[in-house]
Amino acid sequence: MMEADRPEKLFVGGLNLKTDEKALKAEFGKYGHIIKVFLIKDRKTNKSRGFAFVTFESPADAKAAARDMNGKYLDGKAIMVAQTIKPAFESSRWVPPTPGSGSRSRFSHRTRGGGSSPQRPPSQGRPDDGRGYVGYFDLWPYRAPMPRKRGPPPRHCASPPHKRRDPGDFVPALREYSRRYYGHSSVPDYCPXRGDGNRNGYRGRDHDYMDHPSKGSYREPLKSYGGPCGAAPVRGTPPSYGGGCCYEEYQGNSPDACSEGRSSEALPVVLPDAYSRDHLPKAYSGGRSSSSNSYSRSDRYGEEGCYEEYRGRSPDAHSGGRNSSSNSYGQSHHYGGEGRYEEYRGRYEEYRGRSHEARSGGRSTDAHSGGRSDNAYSGGHDSSSWSDCCGGGGRYEEYQGRSLDANSGGRSPEAYSGGHDNSSWSDRYGVGGHYEENRGHSLDANSGGRSPDTHSGGRSSSSNSYGQSHRYGGEGHYEYRGRSHDAHSGGCSADAYSGGHDSSSRSHRYRGGGRYVEYRGRSLDANSGGCWPDAYSGGHDSSSQSYRYRGGGCYEEYRGRSLDANSGGRSPNAYSGGHDSSSRSHRYGGGGCYEEYRGRSLDANSGGRWPDAYSGGHDSSSQSNRYGGGGCYEEYRGRSLDANSGGCSPNAYSGGHDSSSQSHRYGGGGRSLDANSGGRSPDAYSGGHDSSSQSNRYGGGSRYEEYRGRSLDANSSGRLPDAYSGGHDSSSWSHRYGGGGRYEEYRGRSLDANSGGRSPNAYSGGRDSSSNSYDRSHRYGGGGHYEEYRGRSHDTHSRGQSPDAHSGDRSTEAYSRGRNSFSNSYGQSDHYGRGGRYEEYQGRSPDAYGGGRGLNSSNNSHGRSHRYGGGGRYEEYRGPSPDAHSGGHDSSIKSYGLSDRYGGGGHYEEYQGSLPDAYSGDHDRSSNSYGRSDRYSRGRDRVGRPDRGLPLPMETGSPPLHDSYSRSGCRVPRGGGRQGGRFERGEGQSRY
């Protein structure tokens, strides 16, 4: 009779000798909470013996694990998993050894014909010590005395006694298991051989492991079980571990205790009492095969299914630049739901070795090294272990490998964290864990490419690590308490981040109850290119006490000298020139007012050549729940996010690499967020491809195609004057912030003037845009007015060649190339909602839209409209005069038509023409023109009159039409009889 003695306890056999406790816990942990993982090791060598015990908290979890894992491959070897069982015999009495009965084993065997010594009660032998688990692995430390004198073994196989149960009841064919897991059977059908026990038994090589009356032996002869001639051991009941097979430890002489089985001599195993307190687990991988570093199967973000992330065994871009075919991610519910998500499944090799590819610019064997190293990403280590990343009860080890983005400006292969673990286990945004974020060498490697472990200047910032806390919830303490050398000094200062002070007091960062003093120290990221130790706020308190995004308090954001000190190592006050760049307000909610970005510039992305450049090598803010809620806001999308090359490299973002490939980054099915091409293509961001496909980025029910154009942040390596999108639409339909409308973001020449400092229409130019700042308003809601960009003073948008922002010239005020732009200013309106009107750019003087030719652009002015909603019309840029979109030519045919730009039922005709313009770098980009359509909605045609039988505007070979929106007043309908058609980008041949 057999029964599960401890159903929560599993026996795991057939293990690879390189598999350690951590790998076992990772692999089995997905089935439930594990109390203990006990890997059997050799006492002398402390090496694995190839089997282990895993104890779950729940027997049901253990049963599920045994069912699923039995026969699966772990680190290249098929393993056996079974619940430990208790063999129950009709007699529970222990049988002492038969005097004079020697054998190969140290233990005597009863035979059918032979007698046995009188039985003694359990109290005299190996007792059942309350655990009820009696087996050959539990004989330690209790041993009955062994006779000193050994007699000759039996001459033949004796039949078992009549009360002896068939060994198959508790030890199924051992040969079957050993053949399956070790290549051939090492358990022959045999009778105990003749000979002296001292020569044939365990005395020879392992004589020191002979039995002792006081201590007992810790080895068991596995040959004693399961053979047709084998009898029950007289000193204990035979063990079994369920699952239809008995585990046989490899008995050969090979160092690999689980590999071949060339010898019949059993190797020792160490089984300390109560599952070992003596032996520590082996190191994780140390840069070797990442098979044991693989992610376990788990519901990473959800509840059902299995997640096999990074389960292979060979190193790849994550582990040293070798074959990543087996490192692919397996099936999983990545973020929940019911289907299976296979991320990096099969033979997808991202950063796959030595082939030239767009991400490495043809130089590198992997992506993140900037073309110089083949192990930039994780240096052979596992860069993320198993977890429930954003929920549940798991633990999250984020970015354990050497680097995240290898953002070292292309100079170091270990830019990110220098091979250290920069994030320990935690529920990152969840409930009960601790979060220690950024413990390693660096967070963003923002040292301008001067140090091998870029962020910390070659030193260890581990003591600066965040303390235990619930970062976004709970009641712990928060972050960055140390004072030693850390990442933000660029290798120059020992106290770059907080000047030796506690840069964040106790608080609930985004939750109620506490106060949050954020970035009180000298700097946030010391993004000064390694030149200034106080890059962030010049030693001032850059954030007063507040609830950052929650109700009740006031928020003074970025009061210090700068936001990110992204000065490329030239200026300590890059962002706001020492002024308060944000007054008190509830930023996006409540009843206050918000003055956003009053300082010098918003991004000042001038390519790292101006003292107040945004990205000259730095960035302190990556993706986060900046504004709360369920979405994520990616801030600072200038030249680079993390790997700002220090103003030295044209591949500003991450050295030509994508640190997030195919995935649902924020939900949906997008491809990638930052697939940078290595700075060799004028469309540096995504190589002309759509780097983020359909998804609901921030919610809603529509699709968001973000960054569809050539680049997001003018990642053109400084080669094109149309740095932003290279003539394409870099953001298509979407519900950016939710709701039912659609939002087209960043359609202009560039967002951040990311032209590498070579274009006259650069965004940031390095001038003061404080007077051009946004006025007080409820930017995204409420009932106030929104006056956008009214000023006339010198600002950042001219790239240092003109005192104004949008003109790219030398005029004295921002918008109109030297003329009075008061009339060009935006009128009062509800910019994004409710019942007001939006008068955008109503004036009549020469302006930025007029190309500086001095012509009257009154007809170019925007008409009254609800720009993003309501029932009005939007007349954007109707006139015939030269303008910024046409490179000084007549763009009347490119003018925008009457329409509700973001709502209503009209058509939106955007940029249909064929003339050289800011989008095309002075080349003919007719195929890039936008077609007439309802770009953002369906509905009634408000462009022209009913159908006149003309072909659709985007049809190839259509005859050119008149300028329907020129001053001649000619209104030629362009709908072809189709009312409310959806907008489609003119990727092919355009009629204009």
Curated annotation (Swiss-Prot):
UniProt keyword annotation of RNA-binding present: yes
CDD domains in UniProt: RRM_RBMX_like
Polar residues bias (residue ranges): 564-574, 644-664, 752-774, 818-828
Matching Pfam families: RRM_1
SMART domains in alphabetical order: RRM, RRM_1
Single GO MF annotation: snRNA binding
One BP term from GO: mRNA splicing, via spliceosome
RRM domain mapped to chain residues: 8-86
Biased composition (Basic and acidic residues): 297-316, 335-371, 472-488, 785-798, 831-842, 920-948, 981-992
Keyword RNA-binding assigned: yes
Region (Disordered) location: 91-130, 144-169, 188-207, 278-385, 397-511, 562-588, 644-992
Domain of life: Eukaryota
Coiled-coil intervals, chain numbering: none
The name this protein goes by in its record: RNA-binding motif protein, X-linked-like-3
Species for this entry: Pan troglodytes (Chimpanzee)
